[in-house]
Amino acid sequence: MLQIPVAKVAVLAATFAFDRPYTYKIPQPLTDTLRPGCRVMVPFSRGNRPCEGMVLALDKAEDDPKLKPITRQLDPEPILSLELIRLAVWMHDRFFCTIYDALHAILPAGVWYRVSTVYCAAPELDAAAALAQCGRSKQRRLALETVLEHGGRCPLDELQAAFGDKDPASALHWLVEQKFLTVEGTQKRVVRDKQLEYASLAVPLEEAQEEIRRRRRAPHQVAILELLCTIGRASAGEVCQFTGAPRSSMKALVQQGVVHIDTEPYFRRPVHYTGQPQPIPVLTPAQEQVFDGLKELLRAPDAQAALLFGVTGSGKTLVYLHLIAQALAAGQGAILLVPEISLTPQMIEAFSAYFGDTVAVLHSGLPLSERYDEWKRIRAGLARVVVGTRSAVFAPVQDLGLLIIDEEQEDTYKSESTPRYHARDVAKFRCAQHRALLLLGSATPDVVSRYYAETGRYHYFTLPDRFNARKLPDVIIADMKQELRNGNSGSISSVLYGELEENLRRGEQSILFLNRRGASKIVTCAECGATYSCPNCSVSLTYHQGNQMLICHHCGYRRRVDPQCPVCGGELRFLGDGTERIEADLHALFPGVETLRMDADAIAMAGTHEALLQRFARERIPIMIGTQMITKGLNFENVTLVGVLNADQSLYVGDYRANERTFSLITQVIGRSGRGDAPGRAVIQTFTPANETIRQAARQDYDAFYRSEIRLRKLNGTPPFSEVLAVTVSGAQENAVVRCCAYIRDYFRQTIGERAEVLGPAPLPVVRMNNRYRYRVTLYCNQSKAVRRAAANIVMYCNTEKSFRDVTVFADDNPLD
């Protein structure tokens, strides 16, 4: 049979259960322009609804009347490379998401279209006859009447509004099949490309000078011409601003052929570096030794992976800088990932000083327009070094040679929404595709990463000492049980109070860490014990002193606090101090001493992380109180004291990673102290001072912690000695959720058998969130294709089976909670 050109297309509307590359005919006008990586509009499903799609591959196939044609090409050039297309398909298989979910993670939000579906009355439609053919079907008549009432063109959302709670899809499908209605799609870009107009002379210089003499009665036109005669070419807006001339004067000169206007792409950017790049500082002998080893891996013909363990303040960033310079010299690009948005300003400032305008920044805190334009600069090869948070791992860097993940143990590198990917896994795939070097850096490496280094899967490098032989902070463990026995029930121990007093006397700065925002975690009645709980979630409401509101940090529900208990009228007690309460306590303990609070609420008021950090550094504010965002990467030379206010908070949470998270948090925040010339100190407040993890963190002895933790993991069969695969079920009815979970558990036990330990159903730590109950079945196994296929099959089955229609099911690889 006749072979025709076809395209394999990932379709936006496809759910996970039906997601696959769909085959579409390529119309003759598109055969020369359509390529993989271009977006298209295609008819999809029974109603041929216009839908956006991405071309994954081109092929030939036998002509089949059932094949639908592509209706429109949206991109004149591919917006996605073949490597990133392969990445999207791999993510579909690896993270249990649709291909389009992966594409939405890979591409910036500004590149997407808003696609609207419009139903139109067919040309020459006999409305009366069509309504008669609708018969007794009220839905068909309503759909047709709604389209006619809108003048024969009605957007789908208007039709859905007319139908209320009912779905108009079946009625619309029938009307389209009967050729009473046609379907159209409209597209509008979320962010448009910005163009800048430039003005230049359209005539020779001598002729322009003659025009100046002839136009003495038009002073604004003369001013424009004189400026262009001097500088040759400039932004049209700046020319008008500099000369004071209105746009009408510029327009008149253009219409008369004296001035020419052309346009160039303009990049909206978060950071502009105008100075000359500085030389990178010289490495110490220890850093030089590490750099030499990593440089050899960078030059290797195949993909390589390495773990760099360096204590806080050992100068890992300087090694990164030299490695990136080496990659650039070889004509390669580089990506540096940081765990928090708060770290990007410091990194960007440092990297721009050494690499100039070739540095781009990507993170979710940027406006859509700036993210989109930074992505365009990277794709065009104008930016070869990318610094950003988790999503920057998808940056379309040309000739990627180096990908660095700083503080690689951080949970923020794992996405908790679809697609549920870990940046480290994506980085491994990309480095394999580019034959690049993946470098993981940390003062407290992930236990799994350290095990891979020990067993030879990663190369291993160490920086065991601080830069310039600076000492690690001296650490004191404060026993909060003893403080209670001594009559101190406050959040600041006598030990920490004395150290803060000493720092204030010296004019040095202090940082206090508490991973709980708000003022009080629980508000309870001293008489009857009633507590304020969220009506939508199974958690207590947190009291915020600034606005005197009780707020749920999961769903956003808020309400005013009552003057007394609403149940019995008793006195209310505020328990479980947060950052707001600590700030108030500090003002009471040290009257007149300025403090700065850095948590999500304070940042929302200040506008950006950067504004608060700059204020802390510039004004030398004596004390900063903050949540997890202050624990890593920040470098303030005048900070000589760190206080960890509740070291037990993350230690007893029933997760196999609890010890690791606690050790990492304490070690990282202690490392903010003593990074300048003055020695550092730290105070760890705990109710369990004999706990081995806390004592190891106080000694900052990662090797001892790793040895004890890996023994425990091996005994329990937890990662790295297995992998975790979780299938989560959520729904409004708890019994329906548990019933579905039980079915999934039984399915795994029958299909996988001895290859996995199957646990559950078990409630999540917050079992009800936004009025939906959440339970989980967990597998501890060595993941194989068969295990993953079984997980994908059960997710697809449960999301399409009518008996489970009231629940939502998804799978997650190594979940955080």
Which sequence ranges carry the predicted segments?
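A short, contiguous, amphipathic alpha-helix enriched in charged residues
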Residues: R35-P36, A736-R749
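Short beta-strand elements
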Residues: T182, L596, I752-L764, R805-D813
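C-terminal structured "cap/appendage" subdomains that terminate the fold
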Residues: Y747-S784, A790-I794
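Surface-exposed amphipathic alpha-helical segments in non-transmembrane regions
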Residues: Y702-A704, I710, R745-Q750, S784, ...
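Inter-lobe coupling/hinge segments of SF2-like helicase ATPases
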Residues: G275-K295, P301-V738, E754, P765-V767, ...
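Short beta-strand micro-motifs in enzyme catalytic cores
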Residues: P5-A7, E197, E723-L725, Y773-Y775
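Short secondary-structure junctions
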Residues: T15, F590-V593, F748-E757, E801-D806
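Accessory, non-ATPase domains that flank or precede helicase/AAA+ motor cores in DNA-metabolism machines
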Residues: M1-S442, E454-R470, Y780, R788-A792, ...
